[in-house]
Design a protein with these regions (language model features):
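Feature marks extracellular polysaccharide-active and adherence modules
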Residues: 79, 86, 92, 98-100, ...
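Leucine-rich solenoid repeat scaffolds
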Residues: 400-445
């Protein structure tokens, strides 16, 4: 059904645009005043009939320009304007769709090259707004769904769908995408997602079936991108929807994923690692952040070599049991966190019910409990093997709980607000040394 819907939509656009595409391609190949060589591979969407007035449907004209550029590869430029797009656009292999605004666009969201997307309301499984082929690129534009409402948020298909080799989404602002960027599930390699800012309501980036080093850099999801009155925004309902529903970064099968300088506020789950029909993820995650989340990082299933997470900042404060890192029983691989900070009113910082190895090094742990109120252990594990070294525990009560089921632990060189209180239920299977001794709990009322 999903494939038929996508194919029917793309066939309709192709048929509607045939005459315009032929005439525009003839101009580009030499039948008119210019040709592909003399214009340097640049194609203007307005030369193909796009108006950019926000009223007339520009879908057919933009697709005609894209198809003309696809004959030999090239760039389709979108001059400043508001381009109403009522169906899916196919970006052919070797083609770039390029607007004029490289910077994030918050205070004046409808300036520059803006796509007004209206297709797919209540049809989440339909074709994406941009269906991207091998070595295609979309950059320097803004996407806005004018029919979406903050108090009546409805499902829409993905804004971007990447498949194949070497796709790029860069310098893009998303005002109110329901589902933002999907990579796969078709086989793909070496995606590049760079400098994407905006509001992703339900899902931000989903990666799957990537067999060779994808890269995600400088991606920032925040509810305030859909708070400006000019685009019908409203902080409170958008904020609430995101912390209840948004999964910002989801990783299925991806080999050697590189993720740097990414952030979400707020979220149901900031970073989620799942099993799909294609497999699981491994990779390097540096400078990542999740704020006002229910769970910042949720590890359900990963490849055996696992995850390397460094310089992360995690704040959990929503839901019944806010926690920063949760490793499920279904995980049987390695998770390593270095130089990360955990703060805010979280109930716990790291909870591990699975995993082959878990390593926490040079991290700062704290919770919303006051210095005089003892809460649950900040770090708790009941499976796999655990190492905690060189960390600081800035809260009252137990810092670490080694529960029955944990096979082995090394706890060393840690300090804390009142020393480091360690609950040890695994006896001699724990090596505990060189930690600041725990102080007695203060008397009631003191």
């Amino acid at each position: 059904m999903k494939s038929a819907m996508r194919n029917n939509s793309l066939l309709l656009i192709s048929n509607l645009s045939l005459a315009l595409m032929v005439s525009f391609a003839a101009l580009a190949s030499g039948a008119g005043a210019t040709d592909t060589k003399s214009n340097g591979g640049m194609f203007a969407a307005r030369d193909a009939g796009a108006r950019g007035d926000g009223t007339n449907d520009d879908t057919v004209a933009i697709q005609a320009a894209l198809d003309a550029a696809g004959q030999a590869g090239g760039v389709v430029s979108l001059a400043p304007g508001r381009y109403l797009v009522k169906a899916s656009l196919r970006i052919p292999p070797g083609v770039t769709l390029q607007g004029v605004h490289d910077a994030p666009n918050w205070s004046a969201p409808l300036k520059g090259s803006v796509i007004l997307a209206t297709a797919g309301r209540d049809a989440e499984e339909g074709p994406a707004l941009f269906e991207m082929g091998d070595s295609s690129q979309v950059r320097a534009l803004t996407v806005y769904y004018p029919d979406q409402r903050p108090k009546d948020i409805r499902p829409y298909p993905w804004t971007f769908h990447l498949r194949g080799f070497d796709n790029t989404v860069e310098d893009v602002t998303l005002i109110n995408s329901y589902n933002a960027i999907r990579i796969g599930p078709e086989p793909n390699v070496r995606h590049r997602i760079r400098n994407v800012y905006g509001c992703a309501l339900r899902r931000g980036v989903l990666v799957d079936t990537c067999s060779d080093i994808g890269r995600i850099d400088n991606v920032h999801f925040h509810c305030h991108w859909w708070s400006v009155p000019e685009v019908g925004g409203e902080w409170a309902p958008v904020h609430e929807y995101m912390w209840k529903n948004c999964e910002a970064f989801i990783f299925g099968r991806t080999d050697w994923e590189y993720v740097n300088n990414t952030f979400v506020f707020p979220a149901n789950i900031g970073y989620r690692f799942i099993h799909t029909a294609a497999g699981e993820a491994n990779g390097h995650f540096s400078g990542i952040g999740a704020d006002e989340a229910q769970i910042c990082v949720k590890v359900e299933s990963i490849q055996r070599m696992g995850l390397l997470i460094s310089n992360g900042q995690f704040v959990a404060m929503r839901g019944e049991h806010p926690r920063q890192v949760v490793i499920d029983k279904s995980c049987s691989a390695s998770v390593r966190l270095v130089n990360c900070a955990f703060w805010g009113p979280a109930e716990q910082n790291v909870v591990a019910h699975g995993g082959r190895f878990l390593s926490l090094s040079d991290c700062y742990f704290s919770s919303g409990y006051s210095a005089k109120t003892s809460g649950p252990p900040l770090v708790e594990a009941d499976a796999g093997r655990l190492q905690v070294r060189g960390c600081s525990f800035d809260a009252a009560g137990p810092g670490i709980a080694l529960r029955k089921g944990l096979r082995h632990a090394i706890i060393s060189e840690n300090n804390g607000l009142r020393g480091v209180e360690i609950v040890n239920e695994i006896g001699t299977n724990a090596i505990i040394s060189l930690n600041e001794p725990a102080e007695p709990a203060p008397a009631p009322g003191r």
